[in-house]
Amino acid sequence: MRRKDFDPNKLDLSEKVVEINRVTKVVKGGRRFSFSALVVVGDENGYVGAGNGKAVEVPEAIRKGIEDAKKNLIKVPMVGTTIPHEIVGRDGGGQVLLKPAYEGTGVIAGGPVRAVLEQAGIRDILTKSLGSNNAKSMVNATIAGLNQLKTAEQVARLRGISVKDLQG
Protein backbone atom coordinates (compact mmCIF):
# COMPACT_ATOMS: atom_id res chain seq x y z
CA MET A 1 0.00 0.00 0.00
CA ARG A 2 1.20 3.50 -0.80
CA ARG A 3 2.41 5.88 1.88
CA LYS A 4 -0.33 8.30 2.85
CA ASP A 5 0.51 11.96 2.35
CA PHE A 6 -2.99 13.24 3.08
CA ASP A 7 -5.31 13.57 6.07
CA PRO A 8 -8.67 11.75 5.72
CA ASN A 9 -10.30 14.24 8.11
CA LYS A 10 -9.52 17.19 5.79
CA LEU A 11 -11.18 15.57 2.75
CA ASP A 12 -14.86 16.10 1.98
CA LEU A 13 -15.80 12.41 1.97
CA SER A 14 -19.16 10.93 1.02
CA GLU A 15 -20.11 7.35 1.74
CA LYS A 16 -22.06 4.66 -0.05
CA VAL A 17 -23.30 1.47 1.58
CA VAL A 18 -22.64 -1.39 -0.85
CA GLU A 19 -24.04 -4.29 1.15
CA ILE A 20 -25.69 -5.03 4.48
CA ASN A 21 -25.73 -8.64 5.62
CA ARG A 22 -27.39 -10.29 8.60
CA VAL A 23 -24.88 -12.71 10.10
CA THR A 24 -25.41 -15.33 12.79
CA LYS A 25 -23.21 -16.73 15.50
CA VAL A 26 -24.48 -19.97 17.02
CA VAL A 27 -23.92 -20.09 20.78
CA LYS A 28 -24.97 -22.50 23.52
CA GLY A 29 -28.20 -20.59 24.18
CA GLY A 30 -29.22 -20.34 20.51
CA ARG A 31 -28.39 -17.92 17.71
CA ARG A 32 -26.91 -14.47 18.11
CA PHE A 33 -27.68 -12.13 15.19
CA SER A 34 -25.64 -9.14 14.09
CA PHE A 35 -25.25 -7.03 10.96
CA SER A 36 -22.26 -6.64 8.68
CA ALA A 37 -21.93 -3.55 6.45
CA LEU A 38 -19.63 -3.03 3.46
CA VAL A 39 -19.10 0.72 2.93
CA VAL A 40 -17.17 2.70 0.29
CA VAL A 41 -16.07 6.30 0.98
CA GLY A 42 -14.55 8.82 -1.41
CA ASP A 43 -14.28 12.50 -2.23
CA GLU A 44 -15.16 11.99 -5.94
CA ASN A 45 -11.83 13.60 -6.77
CA GLY A 46 -9.31 10.74 -6.68
CA TYR A 47 -9.54 9.44 -3.11
CA VAL A 48 -11.42 6.23 -2.28
CA GLY A 49 -11.48 3.55 0.41
CA ALA A 50 -13.58 0.58 1.52
CA GLY A 51 -14.32 -0.80 4.95
CA ASN A 52 -16.32 -3.38 6.86
CA GLY A 53 -18.29 -2.83 10.02
CA LYS A 54 -20.12 -5.32 12.20
CA ALA A 55 -22.54 -4.61 15.05
CA VAL A 56 -25.86 -5.62 16.58
CA GLU A 57 -27.60 -2.57 15.04
CA VAL A 58 -27.41 -1.57 11.34
CA PRO A 59 -26.51 2.15 11.87
CA GLU A 60 -23.67 1.17 14.20
CA ALA A 61 -22.35 -1.35 11.63
CA ILE A 62 -22.42 1.37 8.94
CA ARG A 63 -20.60 3.84 11.24
CA LYS A 64 -17.88 1.25 11.93
CA GLY A 65 -17.62 0.53 8.19
CA ILE A 66 -17.13 4.25 7.46
CA GLU A 67 -14.38 4.48 10.10
CA ASP A 68 -12.64 1.42 8.62
CA ALA A 69 -12.94 2.81 5.08
CA LYS A 70 -11.34 6.12 6.14
CA LYS A 71 -8.35 4.15 7.45
CA ASN A 72 -7.96 2.41 4.07
CA LEU A 73 -8.07 5.45 1.75
CA ILE A 74 -5.96 5.43 -1.41
CA LYS A 75 -5.16 8.10 -4.03
CA VAL A 76 -6.16 7.07 -7.55
CA PRO A 77 -4.01 8.47 -10.38
CA MET A 78 -6.31 9.78 -13.11
CA VAL A 79 -5.86 11.09 -16.65
CA GLY A 80 -8.73 13.52 -17.14
CA THR A 81 -11.87 11.56 -16.28
CA THR A 82 -10.45 8.05 -16.74
CA ILE A 83 -7.54 5.85 -15.60
CA PRO A 84 -4.03 5.89 -17.15
CA HIS A 85 -3.94 2.26 -18.38
CA GLU A 86 -5.64 -1.14 -18.37
CA ILE A 87 -5.21 -3.34 -15.29
CA VAL A 88 -6.68 -6.42 -13.60
CA GLY A 89 -7.30 -6.07 -9.87
CA ARG A 90 -7.31 -9.27 -7.82
CA ASP A 91 -8.43 -10.08 -4.29
CA GLY A 92 -9.29 -13.60 -3.16
CA GLY A 93 -11.66 -15.03 -5.78
CA GLY A 94 -12.51 -11.60 -7.15
CA GLN A 95 -10.96 -10.38 -10.39
CA VAL A 96 -11.94 -7.09 -12.00
CA LEU A 97 -10.67 -5.84 -15.37
CA LEU A 98 -10.44 -2.03 -15.52
CA LYS A 99 -9.99 -0.34 -18.93
CA PRO A 100 -9.65 3.38 -19.70
CA ALA A 101 -12.42 4.85 -21.87
CA TYR A 102 -12.95 7.94 -24.01
CA GLU A 103 -14.63 10.96 -22.48
CA GLY A 104 -18.41 10.64 -22.62
CA THR A 105 -18.42 6.83 -22.29
CA GLY A 106 -19.57 6.88 -18.67
CA VAL A 107 -19.03 4.26 -15.97
CA ILE A 108 -19.68 0.83 -17.48
CA ALA A 109 -19.62 -1.28 -14.32
CA GLY A 110 -21.89 -3.41 -12.20
CA GLY A 111 -23.02 -2.92 -8.59
CA PRO A 112 -20.10 -2.95 -6.14
CA VAL A 113 -17.48 -1.94 -8.74
CA ARG A 114 -19.60 1.05 -9.83
CA ALA A 115 -19.84 2.27 -6.21
CA VAL A 116 -16.03 2.30 -5.85
CA LEU A 117 -15.44 4.04 -9.19
CA GLU A 118 -18.10 6.71 -8.60
CA GLN A 119 -16.74 7.49 -5.13
CA ALA A 120 -13.23 7.75 -6.64
CA GLY A 121 -14.49 10.33 -9.15
CA ILE A 122 -13.78 8.28 -12.27
CA ARG A 123 -16.32 9.31 -14.93
CA ASP A 124 -15.28 7.22 -17.97
CA ILE A 125 -14.22 3.58 -17.60
CA LEU A 126 -14.99 0.09 -18.90
CA THR A 127 -14.97 -2.82 -16.44
CA LYS A 128 -15.58 -6.55 -16.44
CA SER A 129 -15.88 -8.83 -13.43
CA LEU A 130 -13.88 -11.97 -14.25
CA GLY A 131 -13.99 -13.91 -10.99
CA SER A 132 -16.26 -14.17 -7.98
CA ASN A 133 -19.35 -11.97 -7.83
CA ASN A 134 -19.11 -11.64 -4.05
CA ALA A 135 -19.48 -7.93 -3.22
CA LYS A 136 -16.57 -7.79 -0.76
CA SER A 137 -14.18 -9.55 -3.19
CA MET A 138 -15.24 -7.30 -6.07
CA VAL A 139 -14.80 -4.09 -4.04
CA ASN A 140 -11.39 -5.18 -2.73
CA ALA A 141 -10.27 -6.32 -6.21
CA THR A 142 -11.31 -2.95 -7.69
CA ILE A 143 -9.40 -1.04 -5.01
CA ALA A 144 -6.37 -3.32 -5.49
CA GLY A 145 -6.45 -2.56 -9.23
CA LEU A 146 -6.79 1.20 -8.67
CA ASN A 147 -3.92 1.04 -6.15
CA GLN A 148 -1.61 -0.52 -8.79
CA LEU A 149 -2.20 2.22 -11.38
CA LYS A 150 0.76 4.41 -12.35
CA THR A 151 0.90 7.62 -14.37
CA ALA A 152 3.37 8.08 -17.26
CA GLU A 153 5.48 10.34 -15.01
CA GLN A 154 5.74 7.63 -12.32
CA VAL A 155 6.74 4.95 -14.86
CA ALA A 156 9.35 7.26 -16.44
CA ARG A 157 10.80 8.05 -13.00
CA LEU A 158 11.01 4.32 -12.13
CA ARG A 159 12.79 3.56 -15.41
CA GLY A 160 15.08 6.57 -15.12
CA ILE A 161 14.04 8.08 -18.47
CA SER A 162 12.04 11.12 -19.55
CA VAL A 163 8.32 11.00 -20.33
CA LYS A 164 9.08 11.86 -24.00
CA ASP A 165 11.38 8.82 -24.30
CA LEU A 166 8.75 6.64 -22.66
CA GLN A 167 5.99 7.71 -25.04
CA GLY A 168 8.14 7.20 -28.11
Swiss-Prot record:
GO terms for cellular component: small ribosomal subunit. Residues 13-76 form the S5 DRBM domain. PROSITE patterns: RIBOSOMAL_S5, S5_DSRBD. It comes from the Bacteria. SUPFAM superfamilies: dsRNA-binding domain-like (SSF54768), Ribosomal protein S5 domain 2-like (SSF54211). One of its GO terms (molecular function) is structural constituent of ribosome. It holds the Pfam family Ribosomal_S5. InterPro entries: Ribosomal_Su5_D2-typ_SF, Ribosomal_uS5, Ribosomal_uS5_bac-type, Ribosomal_uS5_C, Ribosomal_uS5_N, Ribosomal_uS5_N_CS, Ribsml_uS5_D2-typ_fold_subgr. The keyword Ribonucleoprotein applies. HAMAP family: Ribosomal_uS5_B (MF_01307_B). Belongs to the universal ribosomal protein uS5 family. With S4 and S12 plays an important role in translational accuracy. Located at the back of the 30S subunit body where it stabilizes the conformation of the head with respect to the body. Part of the 30S ribosomal subunit. Contacts proteins S4 and S8. The N-terminal domain interacts with the head of the 30S subunit; the C-terminal domain interacts with the body and contacts protein S4. The interaction surface between S4 and S5 is involved in control of translational fidelity. This is Small ribosomal subunit protein uS5. It comes from Natranaerobius thermophilus (strain ATCC BAA-1301 / DSM 18059 / JW/NM-WN-LF).
